Amino acid sequence: MGFEIADTEGRYIQADFGKLSIASLYLPSGSSSVERHERKWQFMHYFMEILKGYRSDGREYIICGDWNTIHQEIDIKNFKSNQKTSGCTPAERAWMDDIINDVGFVDAFRLVNSHSDQYTWWSNRGQAWAKNVGWRIDYQLITPGLKDQIVGESIYKEERFSDHAPLIIDYKDLTGLI
C-alpha cells in the first residue's frame, strides 16, 4: 500500500481479477494502549483516502476482514457501557458512517441481515462466547455494483478457530467481472 503501518504489519492484501478486487484488511486494534489507538487512527485516516480512490477507479471491490470497529448499536451487545472503548467510540463509528454514507461502500452483511445479536468477535473473558456477548467487527464492505450479487450470509460458529467467527457472504456468479 505504500503505507508503513499496513506494509510492516501485514494489514492489507489485495488480489485483482479483471474488474474485481478482493482484499483482506486487518485494521489495527487500539485497545492495548494510547499509542496503539493513535496508530489505529493514523491507519484509518490513510485508509479512508485509499477507499475514496477505489470508488473512482472503475473496479468493483470486496474488502473483508477484521475492521476492529463496530458500525452501529446493533453490532455490539453492550453498546452503552462500551462508548469509551476502542472500537466503539463515537469517532470510530462516525468513520464507519463516512465509509458507508459518504464514500459509498455497502455493508454486505447488513444489506441482507438486519437481526440483532449477530456477532463475529467475543472476548475470551467472562464466558462472552457462551452468553453471546459479542461485537460485530468483521465486515465485507463492497462497492454498490455488487449489491445485487449477494445471495446469502452467515456467521460460522460451528467451530472456534479464534476469538473471531468467520463472516461469510455468498455471491452469485461473479465471473463476468473476472
How would you describe each model-predicted region?
Residues 15-18, 143-144, 169-174:
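Active-site beta-strand termini and strand-to-loop segments that position acidic
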Residues 43-133, 137:
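Metal-dependent phosphoesterases centered on the DNase I-like endonuclease/exonuclease/phosphatase
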Residues 9-14, 136-138, 164-168:
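Short hydrophobic/aromatic beta-strand or adjacent loop that forms the aromatic wall/cage
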Residues 3-5, 129-132, 157-159:
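Short Gly/Pro-enriched turn/cap motifs at secondary-structure boundaries
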Residues 151-178:
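Surface polyanion/phosphate-binding segment centered on an Asp-His-Pro turn
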Residues 3, 28-44, 81-85:
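Surface-exposed cleft-lining segments at the edges of enzyme active sites
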Residues 1-31:
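Structured beta-strand-rich core segments of catalytic domains in phosphoester-bond hydrolases
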